[in-house]
């Protein structure tokens, strides 16, 4: 009975992810933090299912910006109608246009940049757990997961705003990636889709050479994947 009462008291947070698979990985990491903080968490609900919604936006190209703004406005309307207590927005769009969005859409309780997860947890009155940095609540089918190996990009393509939003290319240390792979394998993952803004550039900043082949080789050398 006491367990049931505690579950009834737990608030639900809806995470809405727009854009690419790299954004999805960010959402999965945030979901794990929120679950650890004691929330029930849903993903990509079409209508608010909980008291709080967090929209993880995309600002890659014009169509992505439009989709993100429309989603924010849709959930802002839900809040005005009393279907939401709190509405938060994070991700690439708010990283680039935070001040402008805050002025234009005041229904949003707070806008965060792409990497401000700790601040979001703090504003909810919860602690951010650094020890969970490789853990995620997977939204993909149980047999596979995305594996993000870097952030940012050093290229300056005229159509793309990613370097402006996320900054220069930053590779994750190989040891950290392998630790995440081991964790995901322990959860039953058998297939990894390696992702980054510029995959072939992995390692140039850390190891002074392209290291994607070595990363894949080391993964297979040191890991026993389930059959």
Name each model-derived stretch.
Residues 8-202, 211, 217:
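Proteins enriched for Cys/Gly/acidic motifs involved in redox and nucleic-acid/cofactor modification
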Residues 205:
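Active-site core of PLP-dependent enzymes with the aminotransferase class I/II
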Residues 221-227:
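Conserved small/polar residues in nucleotide/adenosyl-binding loops
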Residues 1-7:
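Short, Lys/Arg-enriched N-terminal segments with co-localized hydrophobic residues
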